[in-house]
Amino acid sequence: MYKEIIAYLKLKYGKVKPQSVIGKIIAKNPELKAKIKELIPIIEQEIKEVEQMDIEQIKELAKAYEQTIEKKEKDIEIPVKDKVITRFAPNPSGLLHIGHARAIVLNHYIAKKYNGQFILRIEDTDPDVKKPMIEAYELIPKDVEWLIQEKPDKIVVQSDRLDIYYKYIEELIKQGKAYVCLCKAEEFREYRNKGLPCPHRNQSIEENLELWSKMLKGEFKKGEAVVRLKTDLTHKDPGVRDFPIARIVENPHPRIGYKPVFPLYNFAVVIDDHLLGITHVIRMKEHTNNAIKQSFIYKAFGWEEPIYLEYGALLTDMPTHKSEIRKLIEQKQIEGWDDIRLPTLIALRRRGILPEAIYEYIVKDVGLNKADIKVDWNKIYYYHKIRIDKQTPRYFMIRDPIAIVIENYDDIIDKFEIKNGIPYKKISKHPDVDLGYRELPIKEVLYIDKRDAERLKQKPLRLFELFNIKFVGEIEIEYGDEYSKTKEKAYAVRVISFDVQEAIKNKYPIVQWLPEYEETTLFELDGYKKAYVEPNIKENYVHFIREGYYKRENDKWIFSVK
């Protein structure tokens, strides 16, 4: 829980005293002053663990702490008139990922800071280009609710509102501000690029209403008719000149079935933002060009525009594009949208990452600005660990076990309590003893990881919470019965002392060990692996010492955070 502070102090001063760590903790969390006595053994244990880390691990932990103290906390401020109503408006063609988290959190945080409302609006009026995933209608609200830890004040689905859009399109036609264009795409493009009106621009209102009625009845095929807003034919951007606001769609919508006419994105956005009372549109800077078209629509209706605030992208090296994820799923390279190698919110939830950690990272470290920012997973992990560590039991895990045989076993067994004729060691599950203990039998043959066994040849090791051992030599041991025997390489060792201070003074590596093990499967960011853990683990979220935090899922352990 406090390893980041310890690593920072170790790099800065070399030696770390518990009092120095406590000073840093109390400065940030004054309420812990009354619990100093409880903190000291926890900190002492974590100092021991950091002392055994290699320099790169220590630097990584220290960097996470440095970033939290270098960046002064700056709250997000926005211009406010009366009330604040914001919205997060995803397209359901895929599921939400860490990049969407910036939009969700900023919109929600700002709304709640100013006692306003936060609306989730699912934008699904482009079924040809962005075909909706039917399951997204259930999973997107679930993801949003998970991240903000409450239900949105309102959930709106645009495909439920087609009649509303039709009403306002007809209103513009009746006011002579919109018309039905029957030009082929290339014909209109030629008029537009020359700044000339197409032949349909000056049709009478009656003619346009009749054509509009035919569009709604499905009498036109795709591309034969669109509704255009009258804008500025001399506008410097040809794409703004009489841009379309509604078009024919022939394919059935996955959610509502066949509807001949759908509004285009910018029109539906303006109608909804106005009718829902959106006061602040907080969106990615890539939508700047849309603002020009939306402004023309607002002016056509005589409506006041909301306040626009823009932010940059939240980038990651993991796949986020919907088409890329779909391809990986089809190729069976990943299991689905919740594969933990993805940065989707459903995958992060599967890993057991706390939504509060992501939320705090967005508010404190990402913020509302136009800079594109690469996701700092270590910071998200840090915010997660400061919440979860104090309630997470610790266990041993070995990735590649090798047996060690204790030569002087008979000389040491009287140091342990005996249960059913077998000596055992009672080890706390956490520096906070309230989380309980587990009892591990002490046998003549124990197991350590092969990477630690190689170090044993160079200098003594300390088995965590047990004793110090030295290398004697390589041997072979036999497994099996009289019918089937297997020989296996092992290391003969001797117990040289039980003194932990001796290990610290002489810098013996402190390593994990197992008296027996249970083979399990790990699902990590680079795929599936085998590992060996203590048997009879009851909890579903644990900290495997030196390996990270893992969440149980059926018969395997899912990687959570390092």
Swiss-Prot record:
Known catalytic reactions: tRNA(Glu) + L-glutamate + ATP = L-glutamyl-tRNA(Glu) + AMP + diphosphate
Pfam families in the record, alphabetically?
tRNA-synt_1c, tRNA-synt_1c_C
Molecular function (Gene Ontology), one example: ATP binding
Cellular component annotations (GO), alphabetically ordered = cytosol; protein-containing complex
Motif 'HIGH' region, chain ranges: 90-100
Compartmental location:
Cytoplasm
**Matching Gene3D superfamilies:** HUPs, Ribosomal Protein L25, Chain P
First-listed, main subcellular location of the protein, grouped into a coarse class: cytoplasm
Which HAMAP family is this protein grouped with? Glu_tRNA_synth_type2
**Name of the protein in question:** Glutamate--tRNA ligase
Which source organism? Nanoarchaeum equitans (strain Kin4-M)
